[in-house]
């Protein structure tokens, strides 16, 4: 059995397996919304169900912080389509959100 933990660091949640980074869920906060725009699991750990562990922990932390979830990332969106426990905390992805994200990334 592998030891996993999910930690929030800056604008991402890191999934650690046996103390090493194995994946991340990246986000940017927009007012009271946490906009998830990218999720990634390292190749060595794909197919182990770790994206579910990562996304569930990230969404639980988001809701616990009083933030709304905006699932731009396809992996987060797919998770939410299967798991309805977060339905009341999800905001739709709008053109305004896409424009805001684009502007944020152009500044980097």
Regions found by a protein language model. Name each.
Residues 2-24, 33, 60-108:
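Terminal substrate-recognition subdomain of acyl/acetyltransferases
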Residues 40-46:
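A short, internal acetyl-CoA/4′-phosphopantetheine-binding micro-motif in the GNAT/acyltransferase core
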Residues 29-37:
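A conserved beta-turn-beta hairpin within the catalytic core of GNAT-like acetyltransferases
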Residues 47-59:
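Conserved acetyl-CoA-binding loop-helix of GNAT-fold acetyltransferases
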Residues 36, 50-53, 71:
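Generic alpha-helix structural propensity
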Residues 25, 39:
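Conserved GNAT-family N-acetyltransferase fold
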């Amino acid at each position: 059995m592998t030891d996993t933990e999910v930690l929030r660091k800056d604008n991402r949640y890191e999934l650690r397996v046996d103390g090493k980074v194995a994946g991340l869920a990246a986000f940017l906060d927009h007012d009271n919304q946490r906009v998830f725009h990218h999720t990634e699991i390292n190749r060595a750990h794909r197919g182990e169900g770790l994206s579910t562990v990562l996304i569930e922990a990230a969404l639980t932390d988001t809701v616990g912080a009083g933030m709304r979830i905006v699932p731009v990332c396809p992996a987060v969106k797919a998770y939410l389509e299967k798991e309805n426990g977060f339905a009341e905390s999800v905001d739709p992805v709008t053109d305004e959100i896409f424009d805001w994200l684009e502007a944020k990334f152009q500044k980097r």
